[in-house]
Amino acid sequence: MSLKKSPFFELRSGSVDTLLFTVKTTDLDALRTELVKRFEATPEFFADDVVAIDVRRLADGERVALADIRQMLNDVRMRPVGVVALATQGWAGEAGLPLLEARDRRAPAAKPADEAEPAAVLAVEAAAAPAAAAAPEQSSDPVPTLLQAGGQTLVIDRPLRSGQQIYAKGDLVVLAPVSHGAEIIAEGNIHIYAPLRGRALAGVHGNHDARIFCTCLEPELISIAGIYRTTENPLPADVLGKSVQIRLEEEKLMIEPLRLT
């Protein structure tokens, strides 16, 4: 086989960001009920988002019907793309979904099945076939925009419109408004010196020490290391539209006013 480069396609190692749907119960009826309850108030929020099914929290010997969970996620308009499992969970590869390797830093801990936990946002890599990735192109059109800085701080000084996305491998500094429908993602901290009206996700590879700093908090979603909060739960008056810092404390998001004077 010739090793000459093809002008028509390219295969190379890559990674994508996806929601991580962590399964902590084998009771699929209860899981379905909770999914409907969670999404009925904001049915469009995660529409068409890709998601990986994470079964690492299940106890030894427990199994779930991944095909049924896949259908549940399809029913709420999410797109399951694979399964994240432990090496001992060989059954996870029988559902017809590719096995993925999550690059989160913290190993999953056993928790009670009735303890509420939101989906996590993590970067996952396919264990079998590498993903083809195209170089991002700059455009003034309101389409998704992906920018990466290899471990360095990325500074954005232009407004972000609906549908645009920024990704930073280190810290991210934004000096202009983040509109509804726009998304900013960083593996480190996020600093926003303007109104945040879209989504902000910090510490996306499981960095629980990451923080979000914002001078005007009016978000659709905020997240650190996969722990998130949406506007489905209104923010308190002392932080809504104010300067704040957001951090994690014992797996809970803490939103605190910033004292700038």
From Swiss-Prot:
Belongs to the MinC family. The gene is minC. Interacts with MinD and FtsZ. Keywords: Cell cycle, Cell division, Septation. This is Probable septum site-determining protein MinC. SUPFAM superfamilies: Cell-division inhibitor MinC, C-terminal domain. GO terms for biological process: cell morphogenesis; division septum assembly; regulation of cell division; regulation of cell septum assembly. The keyword Signal does not apply. Cell division inhibitor that blocks the formation of polar Z ring septums. Rapidly oscillates between the poles of the cell to destabilize FtsZ filaments that have formed before they mature into polar Z rings. Prevents FtsZ polymerization.
